[in-house]
Amino acid sequence: MRYTTSFIVFCFLIFLQTNLVKGRTIRICDRKVEGNGTCGPNSNNICLDEFWKNPPSPRLAKSLEGCTCEPRGKRPKFKGLSHVCWCCWSYNSSNPAG
C-alpha cells in the first residue's frame, strides 16, 4: 500500500509541475453548428462531421476536445427536425490556440 500511495503522489506531482510550466489551460465551448435531423445515438459523430466540414481555423482544429448535440425540434429554418452542436476546444493561457 505504501508503494501505491507513493506512486500516486509522484504522478500527481508530475501533473502539477506540467501545469505550472505550461500555464493554465483554458476551455471554450462557444462554437455553434446547426443542422438538419435529430441527434440520435451517434450524435457526437454527427457534430464532429459538421465541425470538420467548416472548421473556424486550422489552428483551432488541433485543440478540438469534442462536441455535444442538443435537439431543437421543428424550426422553420430547417423545414423539419433540427439540432445544434456545441463544440469545445482548449488552449494554454500562455500560448492561445496553438
From Swiss-Prot:
GO biological process, one term: signal transduction
InterPro entries, sorted: SCRL
Superkingdom assignment: Eukaryota
Cellular component GO terms, alphabetical: extracellular region
Keywords: Antimicrobial, Disulfide bond, Fungicide, Plant defense, Secreted, Signal
Cell location: Secreted
Cystine residue pairs: C29-C88, C39-C69, C47-C85, C67-C87
Signal peptide: 1-23
Family membership noted in the UniProt record: Belongs to the DEFL family.
Name the record gives this protein: Defensin-like protein 241
Protein species of origin: Arabidopsis thaliana (Mouse-ear cress)
